[in-house]
Amino acid sequence: MRNSKYLILSSFYFDFNDDLTEITNVKKSFKKQTILDLYRYNDFKIIKKRVFSIDYNLNFIYLPKNIEIIDNFAFYKNQIQILNLSNCINLKIINEDVFFKNQIKHLKLPENIEIIGYNAFSVNQIKILDLSNYIKLKYIEDISFSYNQIKQLKLPQNIEIIKRYAFEKNEIKILDLSNYIKLKQIEIYAFLYNPLTEIKILDDITIEYNNDKDDIWNTFAKYYNDNNKKAGDYKLENNKWKWYPL
């Protein structure tokens, strides 16, 4: 399939720097392509800022194992549906807005990933998000997975902070945070506008909230704080949160 359907790189589509580590120019002849295949180019290290954003309609991308940097907005506003970066062993950072406004349904990241940047995967179509194997990932940045369709969520085992709006506007009903012993802070609006009915959580976590808002997430955060940040199984019953032991 790769030989018959995937784009074969050539000077017809791109200009390269001298050592073939990055694309310096994308030619007009590439505009109608829907597949970007860099898989075999092991010297390729950098995808520059905005290089494939807005004016392209990429459905699939295949990156080389030695890629190190995908810069801000690199694939903004494409139509990528399946994104598998698990072979990219040197990629430790997904920069800001890189895959913002695509159609990603299935996502796999490199095991060594350390940072998922601001707004990196927002406005996609992810339904199941499993980050449990990414042990170096300690922070979920602002807005990084907002406006998806996430129903099932597993966080990294070493997660410490979930930042503002990180999972805003998804489809999470049951949120189980009871296994994350290093989780210390959930910033304001992290799970805003999810249809939450049950939250399992450990004690003494700093959860920020807006006292003037009465949505499901803010009312939970206020109740958790008023309940002395007690570990428990919190359930929404008749539009009110109630505490049960784990």
Q: Positions of the model-derived regions?
A:
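PEST-like, low-complexity acidic/proline-rich intrinsically disordered segments
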Residues: 1-7
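Structural signature of tandem-repeat unit edges
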Residues: 7-21, 30-46, 56-69, 79-93, ...
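Short linear proline/tyrosine/threonine-rich motifs used for host-factor recruitment
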Residues: 25-26, 243
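Acidic, Ser/Thr
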Residues: 27-28, 51
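Consensus positions within tandem repeat domains that build extended binding/scaffold surfaces
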Residues: 48-51, 71-74, 95-98, 117-120, ...
